[in-house]
Amino acid sequence: MNNNKTPDLLKVIVAGALVLLVVHTLGRFIYTPLLPLLIQDGVLTVKQGADVASWNYLGYLTGAVLAMRWHRIEQIRSVLPWALGINVLCTLLQTQTENFELLSFLRLANGISNGIVFVQAPALILEWLARHGRASASGLVYLGVGGGLIVSSGLVSLPADFLSGAQRWWPAFLLSVP
């Protein structure tokens, strides 16, 4: 292996893993450990919590389908930063509301942006890896999701005693900002 390519490979994999950590773990999966606390805080009922999750799932499906529409590399390079920005903005706005309808809308938008990023970021990275003869490293980008699951659990449980309601989204937002 050419040592000159190692730093580039590491940068590409780490960047991709961090993007997936932000959108998929902090944007999507953190809702699972947050939900019982949001119910306990009176922000959501059990039914509302399920409805909010369903809006996010619908958004994710919609985003994944939209991502297939924007499949050329130049389209991905254009759409990906916007989708990532929207995802982080949704997480920020979730820190400001306990309104069920607004939270449902934000989770829908979060899901759409997540679906786009989750399809497009690995595609862009795979294209780069293939061009540099390193396609076998493509699975490493998903370490962001796995590692992020562990991180998100801590982001919910560690501040659980001193955050409440919409404040519980703050740790996810703060970690999402570059």
Where are these regions (language model features)?
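Pair of pore-lining "gating" transmembrane helices in MFS-fold secondary transporters
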Residues: 9-30
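Small-residue-rich segments within alpha-helical transmembrane domains of MFS-like 12-TM solute carriers
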Residues: 25, 29, 111-119, 150
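Cytoplasmic helix-loop-helix junction between adjacent transmembrane helices
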Residues: 106-143
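Helix-breaking motifs and short loop linkers at transmembrane-helix boundaries and internal kinks
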Residues: 43, 96-101
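Conserved MFS/SLC helix-loop-helix module at the cytosolic interface between two early adjacent transmembrane helices
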Residues: 62-98
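Helix-loop-helix hairpin linking two adjacent transmembrane segments in secondary transporters
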Residues: 133, 140-178
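Paired small-residue
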Residues: 90, 101-109
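Short hydrophobic/small-residue motifs within alpha-helical transmembrane segments
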Residues: 56-58, 146-147
